[in-house]
Amino acid sequence: LGDVYKRQGQKVAVMQGRMHHYEGYSYEEVTYAVRVLRLLGCDTLVVTNAAGCVNTDWKAGELMLITDHIKMFSESPLRGENLPEFGVRFPDASKLYTPRLRQVARDCAQKLGLTLREGVYFYCYGPQYETPAEIRAARILGGDAVGMSTAPEVIVAGHCGMEVLGFTLLSNMAAGILDQPLSEEEVLIAG
């Protein structure tokens, strides 16, 4: 799980790293920690990731506040038996990224003089990077960044009634935007 700290009387759990579906883990395993955090009393989840930049008006190295995500092409992490102690069978997903927390992030960025992009995270389960055609499709569908994590955890957090705030480091330009191949090294350098 990670470490637990106390900050202003509140307990804060910090997780380092995550399991990914592309590593062979089931969605139940990928999202297990979110449910454990909820059972421990956590009511807010802050998620971060590094992802490819799909929006051609932006550049690698910028920070994006996640306003929503697209996860259409793989099964749901809620598939299977519903656990009513966490939430209803068919939860609403219209505000998974809590508007109030997004406003707090905007206010903080403004006070610090930081550029904070706002956009939609497009989930692909990998492990291969996306093709240029897939990136064009992601852009047409409204994606601003593309990555291989975050959406499953956020769906489960929403199911559990947790508030969510998400940030993406735009680590590289996505496939086909620049005339160069993608590499894991450029993602690791940025992140």
Language-model-detected regions and their locations in the chain:
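Short, small-residue-biased leader/transition segments that mark boundaries at the very start
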Residues: 2-5
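Short, basic, glycine/proline-bearing loop/turn elements
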Residues: 11-25, 120, 139-140
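General beta-strand structural signal in soluble alpha/beta enzymes
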Residues: 14-16, 45-49, 65, 116-122, ...
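Flexible, glycine/proline-enriched loop segments at strand-loop-helix junctions
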Residues: 16-27, 34, 86-96
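Phosphate/pyrophosphate-binding betaalpha-module
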Residues: 51-111
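Active-site/ligand-binding-proximal alpha/beta "capping" segment
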Residues: 108-144
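A C-terminal functional module that forms or caps the active site or interfaces directly
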Residues: 129-174
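His/Asp/Glu-rich mid-to-C-terminal helical/loop segments that flank catalytic regions of hydrolases
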Residues: 175-191
